[in-house]
Amino acid sequence: PIEFIFEAKQAVIEQREVGVDTKTYARGLRGALRQLPHVIFVGEMRDLTSMSMALSAAETGNLVISTMATQSAAQTVTRIIDSFPPHQQPQIRAQLALTLRAVVSQLLLPRQDGRGRVAAREFMFVNQAIQNLIRDDKVHQITNVIATSLRDDMLSMDDAITELVDKGLVSYETAHPLFHDTEKRASLQKRVFRAAPLAGEGGSR
């Protein structure tokens, strides 16, 4: 179902609901491509067909924006590639390396003060290094590239979570199982427990 109705202000926006305006995601995408759009938003890439159509649309020069139920940029890339049969995966890696521009991943974590949740976000912008990793089937190294690419405005999930803990928004107990880099987790643990007041400090001896 359509969850948000976008108001057309400086552009023509057409929204299609699966089951009402089109029978499937694939048919909806094919119909959209015939209208020569500038931007295509796919609510969620659920299956091989929708992923294949989205990649094909991106290859023709369209900006394609979509969502997936993943927790990191590397996991997103892996999910797309692994959705295809093994004999197609080299081709998909090549397509993805050429067309993917960015991945924003989000985790909603419980706030330390109990007032709802706060978002930790990872930002990956595809540069030459990440293109090569995708093409060469070395997706597992993407997280390390993100962590060392601050000049390219990237931010790893580990660093995003660390910022939330340092600001007092998320507890270390909530954060520590989510870390990819064990050294960063250990460094954060030392800071957190060094900053905490010692039991009985300042009392009589």
Language-model features and meaning:
Residues 1-205:
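Short, flexible helix-loop junctions that flank or precede catalytic/ligand sites
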